[in-house]
C-alpha cells in the first residue's frame, strides 16, 4: 500500500510542471470528500467549500471574517415596510463560467434567479426531481411555506414575496443553499437528458471554475478570469483530500500544501512555534453534539435521554478530545455569542447514579444502543474515536451498553438521515450568524421529516417559539423567545450538547489574503501565495 504522502505524488508533479510555466498554485489540504456539487442537495461544510464558496455566488454575501451581510450578485436591495417583499437589483454583466462542457451565450439575469428558486419551490418544475437527496436546507428552514412567490420585475430585478415576515431572510440569502445556478445550463442538460451532470460538472459565477474531481483524492479548479469582483490572485486551486489530520500537518510542513484545515487542537501550540507556518484561530459559530434518535424506543422518553446526558463526564471528554482552551462545554444548541443565549440554564452534571435511577423509572435498564461516528476529523470533532470510547465507558457505568460504528462521512450522513442510528456524533457550523440557523435546520419539525434533524425530534412548544422568533424583528423580543426555546430543549434533551469549539487553520507564511471565518466556510477568492 502506498504511503499517504506518496499517493499524492502525481499531484505534486503536476503542480511542479505548472510551476515551470509560472502558474500561481494554491493547494489546500481538506478533511473529507464533498458529497457532490449540486449544493442545494447538501448541508455539509465540506461540500459547501467545494461548491458554494468556489463555483457559485449568491444574491448576498458575508463580509469576510464576519457575519455582516453585504452585496453579492445583487448590488442593492429594498425591503417593504411590512417585511413581506424583498426586491433585489442584480449586477449587470456578471458572466457564468465558460468550460469545455458549457459555453454561455448571455450574462446573469433574473431568469437564473427564478430558475434556482422555482426548482426547489415547484414540484412540477422540470428540474425539481433531479435533486435525488431533496432540498435539505431549503426544506429544513421552511422556505417552501415562507416564500409566496419569486417574480421577475425586469431583466436585472427580482422580487421575493413572503407569506410572513422573516427576520433572518437577508442572512438566509447569503447561505450556500441559496447559490444561483445558470438556467441556460439547466436547459442544455435537460434537452440532452443529462440532468445528473449538474451534480458532477457545476457551472456558476464564482471565483473558480470547476475542472475535475477524483473522489477521496482531489478537486481541481482554475481561476475565473471573468469574475465580477476581479480574477483571483492564484491561477489554480486544488483541494487535496486528506482525512488524517497528522498527514495534513506533515504536508503543510513539507510545503506539499500551502493551507491545511483543522489541525488537532493539541497540535496547535507546536505548530505556532514553526517559523514557516501561521496558525489562524477564531471563536467560531460551532456546536459539537450527539443527536439522540427520539423515534427509537426507549429513546423516545425524555427521562432516558436525560439519563444519557447525566452519564457523560463532559469535562473529561472535552479535556481529552479538544485539549485545554480549545473548546468550552456546550449547554444548548448554539454558542453564547449568538442572540438569546440562555445563560441561566445549568448543564447536566456528571451523575451516573442519577442516570441509573432515571433509567429504572423509565423501565429502560440494561439499555443497548449504537453510536455512529465519522472515520475522519473535523473542526467540531477532532477525535471522534476517542470521544466515542469515553462515552462508551461513561455509559457503561450507568448500565448502558454502547456499540460504536465508524463510517465514512457521507455514509454516516446518509444512514443518520434515514434514521438508522440511536446516537450520532455530529457538529454544526453556523452559516449566517442567526440563532435560527442552528435551530430550524437541526431541530424543527420540517427538518425531522426530511431527516436533517437527526434527533428526529418534533416538539410543538419548541416549534411555536422558534417560528415566532423568526417572524418578529425586535432583537430583544427575539432573544426572549430563544431563551424560552432553550428551556424546552434542555428539558426534552434531544441532544447531548458537547462543545463550542474554537476554529483553527494552518498555512504557510507565504500565504496572504486568507481570512478565517466564524461561519467556518473557506473562501480563497482573495488568497495569494508569495514566491
Feature map (PLM): residue ranges:
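Detector for C-terminal structural segments
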Residues: 24-30, 50, 167, 214, ...
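N-terminal lobe/hinge region of extracytoplasmic solute-binding protein
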Residues: 29-82, 118, 125, 201-205
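A structural "hinge/loop" feature
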Residues: 33-50, 73-74, 100-104, 167-179, ...
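Aromatic- and charge-enriched surface segment that lines or borders ligand/interaction sites
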Residues: 75-127, 159, 251, 298-300
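Surface-exposed binding/hinge segments that line
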Residues: 89, 112, 121-186
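Ligand-site clamp/hinge motif
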Residues: 193-199, 224-270
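Structural transition elements
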Residues: 208, 293, 299, 328-362, ...
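A bilobed periplasmic-binding-protein/Venus flytrap-type ligand-binding module shared by bacterial periplasmic
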Residues: 222-225, 284-307, 311, 320, ...
Amino acid at each position: 500500500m502506498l504511503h499517504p504522502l506518496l499517493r499524492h505524488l502525481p499531484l505534486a508533479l503536476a503542480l511542479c510542471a505548472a510551476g515551470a510555466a509560472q502558474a500561481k498554485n494554491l493547494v489546500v489540504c481538506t478533511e473529507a470528500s464533498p458529497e457532490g456539487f449540486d449544493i442545494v442537495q447538501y448541508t455539509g461544510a465540506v461540500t459547501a467549500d467545494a461548491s458554494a464558496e468556489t463555483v457559485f455566488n449568491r444574491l448576498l454575501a458575508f463580509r469576510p471574517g464576519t457575519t455582516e451581510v453585504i452585496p453579492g450578485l445583487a448590488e442593492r436591495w429594498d425591503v417593504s415596510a411590512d417585511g413581506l417583499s424583498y426586491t433585489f437589483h442584480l449586477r449587470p454583466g456578471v458572466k457564468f463560467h465558460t468550460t469545455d462542457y458549457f459555453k454561455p451565450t448571455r450574462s446573469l439575469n433574473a431568469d437564473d434567479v427564478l430558475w434556482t428558486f422555482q426548482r426547489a419551490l415547484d414540484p412540477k418544475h422540470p428540474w425539481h426531481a433531479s435533486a435525488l437527496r431533496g432540498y435539505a436546507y431549503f426544506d429544513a428552514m421552511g422556505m417552501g411555506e415562507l416564500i409566496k412567490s419569486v417574480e421577475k420585475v425586469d431583466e436585472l430585478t427580482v422580487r421575493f414575496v413572503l407569506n410572513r415576515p422573516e427576520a433572518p431572510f437577508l442572512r438566509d440569502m447569503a447561505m450556500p443553499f441559496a447559490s444561483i445556478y445558470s438556467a441556460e445550463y439547466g436547459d442544455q442538460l435537460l434537452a440532452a437528458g443529462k440532468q445528473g451532470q449538474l451534480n458532477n460538472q457545476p457551472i456558476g459565477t464564482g471565483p473558480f471554475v470547476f475542472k475535475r474531481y477524483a473522489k477521496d483524492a482531489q478537486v481541481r479548479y482554475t481561476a475565473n478570469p471573468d469574475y465580477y469582483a476581479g480574477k483571483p490572485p492564484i491561477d489554480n486551486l486544488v483541494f487535496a483530500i486528506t482525512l488524517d489530520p497528522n498527514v495534513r500537518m506533515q504536508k503543510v510542513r513539507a510545503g506539499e500544501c500551502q493551507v491545511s484545515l483543522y489541525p488537532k487542537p493539541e497540535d496547535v501550540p507546536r505548530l505556532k512555534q514553526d517559523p514557516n507556518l501561521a496558525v489562524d484561530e477564531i471563536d467560531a459559530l460551532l456546536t459539537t453534539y450527539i443527536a439522540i434518535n427520539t423515534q427509537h424506543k426507549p429513546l423516545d422518553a425524555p427521562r432516558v435521554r436525560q439519563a444519557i446526558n447525566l452519564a457523560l463526564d463532559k469535562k473529561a471528554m472535552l479535556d481529552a478530545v479538544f485539549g485545554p482552551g480549545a473548546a468550552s462545554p456546550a449547554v444548548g444548541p448554539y454558542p453564547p455569542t449568538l442572540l438569546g443565549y440562555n445563560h441561566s440554564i445549568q448543564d447536566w452534571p456528571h451523575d451516573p447514579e442519577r442516570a441509573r435511577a432515571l433509567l429504572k423509572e423509565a423501565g429502560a435498564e440494561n439499555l443497548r444502543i449504537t453510536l455512529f461516528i465519522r472515520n475522519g476529523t473535523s473542526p467540531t470533532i477532532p477525535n471522534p474515536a476517542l470521544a466515542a470510547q469515553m462515552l462508551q465507558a461513561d455509559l457503561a457505568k450507568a448500565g448502558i451498553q454502547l456499540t460504536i460504528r465508524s463510517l465514512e462521512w457521507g455514509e454516516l450522513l446518509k444512514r443518520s438521515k434515514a434514521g438508522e442510528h440511536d446516537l450520532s456524533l455530529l457538529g454544526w457550523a453556523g452559516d449566517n450568524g442567526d440563532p435560527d440557523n442552528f435551530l430550524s435546520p437541526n431541530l424543527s419539525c420540517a427538518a425531522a421529516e426530511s431527516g436533517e434533524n437527526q434527533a428526529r425530534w418534533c416538539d410543538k412548544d419548541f416549534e411555536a417559539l422558534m417560528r415566532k422568533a423568526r417572524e418578529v424583528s425586535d432583537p430583544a423580543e427575539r432573544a426572549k423567545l430563544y431563551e424560552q426555546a432553550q428551556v424546552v430543549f434542555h428539558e426534552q434533551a434531544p441532544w447531548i450538547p458537547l462543545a463550542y469549539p474554537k476554529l483553527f487553520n494552518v498555512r504557510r507564511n507565504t500565504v496572504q489574503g486568507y481570512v478565517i471565518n466564524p461561519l467556518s466556510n473557506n473562501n480563497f477568492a482573495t488568497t495569494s501565495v508569495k514566491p
